[in-house]
Amino acid sequence: MDRTTARPNRRAVLATGVGAALAATAAAAGPAHAAPGRGARVEGRLRALERTHDARLGAFAYDTGTGRTVAYRADERFPIASMFKTIAVAAVLRDLDRDGEVLARRVHYTADYVKRSGYSPVTGLPENVANGMTVAELCEATLTRSDNTAANLLLRDLGGPTAVTRFCRSVGDHVTRLDRWEPELNSAEPGRVTDTTSPRAIGRTYGRLILGDLLAAHDRERLTRWMLDNRTSDERFRKGLPADWLLADKTGGGDYGTNNDAGVAWPPGRPPVVLAVQTTRFTPDAEADNVLVAEAARLLAEAMTD
């Protein structure tokens, strides 16, 4: 990678996202695989990483410029955890909002609702419980802070968790599904099919949302801006990817050490790369392993740029 190339500019990324629409469409249709030798080497390193960290690891990466793909357990199901939140916000933007009217609507909720939803660093603030929040503010809290109450309120407006599944089916994702609310959806028992996705499925869907034409241009820009401002991945993708890559992503975590990250990254002077890493472990109280996610991201980045 050319270290002298300037870091990608946020404004340029937001303005030209649709320029990668053809690449995103190619990813959805089934991208080319990496060269056999290179792909085997990367998969071997991911397998070794999985063994070292005593976890099950799934990974998917797609270079929208070259078509190069890395896939490891990419079609196996893993708990989706909070990665559903990107799709919920996209569904609000596509299916509910009209000319900003829905985004401007103020939603009121109770302290008990916050308590039942679990992790709620924004909606749980006393001033927000007292005054409510606009739908736009709920979307922002959902994506930048992974706020559970905000996500549940969006799901309520959409008609419940299965609205995420319906959205995915409508855009050709036949794997990703959501069945329960926060925080129950994070139980992550081995073998569970409900509330799951695969690295390839979530990677493709995220890529098409951020780079393609699934959303109107102004909605795609909103979604991407919120994901660029994500504050939950400092020890995951942001730790593993080169510091000069621009990243729009969403994390997720749950029981059984479930720990995920997925999004789109812009290397300097190169087309964007779609990335997804999902991990889970073998006991209900297992610790989430941020180092595993960060190291997997590092390996994927190296594979995309070597």
Curated annotation (Swiss-Prot):
Extra remark beyond the main annotation: The class A beta-lactamase family has a specific amino-acid numbering system, sometimes called Ambler or ABL numbering and often misspelt as Amber. A multiple sequence alignment was used to derive a consensus sequence and then the consensus was numbered taking into account insertions and deletions. This allows use of identical numbers, e.g. for active site residues, despite differences in protein length. UniProt always uses natural numbering of residues, hence there appear to be differences in numbering between this entry and some papers.
Catalytic activity: a beta-lactam + H2O = a substituted beta-amino acid
Keyword Hydrolase: yes
Alphabetical GO biological process terms: beta-lactam antibiotic catabolic process; response to antibiotic
Gene this chain is encoded by: blaF
Source organism of this protein record: Streptomyces fradiae (Streptomyces roseoflavus)
Catalytic residues in the record: 82 (acyl-ester intermediate)
Family to which the UniProt record says this protein belongs: Belongs to the class-A beta-lactamase family.
SUPFAM superfamilies the UniProt entry points to: beta-lactamase/transpeptidase-like (SSF56601)
InterPro entries xrefs: Beta-lactam/transpept-like, Beta-lactam_cat, Beta-lactam_class-A, TAT_signal
Binding-site residues, substrate: 250-252
Record-given protein name: Beta-lactamase
